[in-house]
Swiss-Prot record:
Belongs to the YciB family. InterPro entries: YciB. It is found in: Cell inner membrane. GO terms for cellular component: plasma membrane. Plays a role in cell envelope biogenesis, maintenance of cell envelope integrity and membrane homeostasis. This is Inner membrane-spanning protein YciB. It comes from Haemophilus influenzae (strain PittGG). The gene is yciB. It is a multi-pass membrane protein. Pfam families: IspA (PF04279). The keyword Cell membrane applies.
Amino acid sequence: MKQLLDFIPLILFFITYKLGGVREAAIVLVVATILQIVILKWKYGMVEKQQKIMASAVVFFGLLTAYFNEIRYLQWKVTIINGLFAIVLLVAQFQFKTPLIKKLLGKELQLPEKAWNTLNLGWALFFIICMLVNIYISHNMSEEAWVDFKSFGIIGMTVIATIISGVYIYRYLPKDGSNSKDGEK
């Protein structure tokens, strides 16, 4: 239910854009995002920090898009958010010597430090690629192509990155059903 709720604002944005246009779609996106946060708070008692950041960015850039009737503000949001995610992952790894992915998943998975570092770098690279693809599409393709990319392309890229991560992690999982703490074979 929680994951489905994450996609509702995006789906409503896409449908409204196709039926109405940029301004209407941005307004629907902002309202749906605010409702999403209210529902999450009501149903689960809390909203995760990442969701608050994303919702704030959607509201800010969505309102700019609606006010100016110009999609470039939402295009900037995608670029900025992906860039920030990449920077945070890289700074955590190289400045603080702590792969952020380990902080997020370390309770569920036991992996060697080298694997956490590789996974963290992989996701940083993923966010950089998303940022660069977004810049390319927003500057060189039609507005409609960008909306399609934003609605489905990034989701597809995320699914592929998740599968690659899963395949990478699988090699470190215990093969005999034991709960090895070091994650080594």
